[in-house]
Amino acid sequence: MRVGSRKLRRDEKGFTGLEAAIVLIAFVVVAAVFSYVMLGAGFYTTQKSKKVVDTGVKQASSSLTLDGQYIYLNCTSAANGQTGSSGKVGQVYFYVTQTAGGSPVDLNMTSIAITTDTGFKQLFFNDSCTPGTDCPWWYDDTVGDGDNVVEPNEKYKITIDVNNTEWSGIGELNPNDVVTIEVRPPIGAPLTITKTLPPSFTNLTFV
């Protein structure tokens, strides 16, 4: 009876060691799975944070810049303008390019806002009107591939017919007026241009 008892105790010790090994392996597996899950969650959080930061930067910075430092005032009678110290602007035009590192800008989804001492008006691009006839503003690609998107190394001319009735809320642009023009893309900060107009206009005045 004692021999059998000792054998039973040896078997119990052996079983206990095997059980401990199984439990240890289980702990290792669980720890590995937990680490993998936490690592994956960390990568996801990092990617999500990067995406949020990138989106914030795009929304806070402008993708358009003025090409050169001037805007041009067409004060000819053909543009319904008038020259001299009591003149008025017929059309305003200027050139824009994409900023370094900026995102492409779809001009068909862009709006122009004008602020004067008289008032404020914002108008989106209208592709159903005829440039130079009944459009409040339009664009032409001077260096580009002919589409509606401003991309790297491209230059677009934006023309604003300030005498178009849709701009009636801003009044006339006369000598010595202060005018702010904003080009507002669908994403990102606007390109803001503020100018004080000269005391007298010629047929083509740049400021």
Swiss-Prot record:
Flagellin is the subunit protein which polymerizes to form the filaments of archaeal flagella. Belongs to the archaeal flagellin family. It comes from the Archaea. Residues 1-14 form a propeptide. The keyword Oxidoreductase does not apply. Keywords: Archaeal flagellum. It is found in: Archaeal flagellum. GO terms for biological process: archaeal or bacterial-type flagellum-dependent cell motility. It comes from Archaeoglobus fulgidus (strain ATCC 49558 / DSM 4304 / JCM 9628 / NBRC 100126 / VC-16). One of its GO terms (molecular function) is structural molecule activity. GO terms for cellular component: archaeal-type flagellum. This is Probable flagellin 2. It holds the Pfam family Arch_flagellin. InterPro entries: Flagellin/pilin_N_arc, Flagellin_arc.
